Amino acid sequence: METQELNNISSQVRRDIVRMVSGASSGHPGGSLGCADFLTLLYFEVLKHDPSNFDMDGKGEDVFYLSNGHISPVWYSVLARSGYFPVNELGTFRKLSTRLQGHPSTDKNIPGVRMASGSLGQGLSCALGTAVTKKLNGDSSLVYTLHGDGELQEGQIW
């Protein structure tokens, strides 16, 4: 993918973030906006994944865990823009009884989400467990995780 195309997607992701947080009058726009380029590059260029065939096991594909779940707006936007669910669902962010809440959750059956995040630091434990499992199963695909600076100073990581 060309750099300009990635820049265009990242710019759209930023617009999505502002719309979601503004529409909900709630959320964490700073961390989300700051990670737009990283997650865009990860999902559109680096990660080996198949949005049309998502399953919780992730066998034979790269896996991503968002540990600092409060930046869910950026992840929801990138997931939608890369084909995991319809982009128009972004308008339901933090609305009652919808899937896209302030922290991603597995009980909402959001394609692309393999871990409920909110307990700071647990993403590292899940990523390590997944990496060991992949290695034991002869699966050479990679595991990625993203953590916030604040969570690195508390919880399981600290």
Predicted regions and their residues:
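N-terminal capping segment at the start of a domain
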Residues: S10-S26
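Alpha-helix capping and helix-loop boundary segments enriched in small/acidic/polar residues
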Residues: Q4-E5, S26, G148-E151
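Cofactor-binding active-site loop characterized by glycine-rich and histidine/acidic residues
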Residues: I17-M20, S32-W158
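N-terminal hydrophobic or amphipathic helices/low-complexity stretches enriched
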Residues: M1-V13
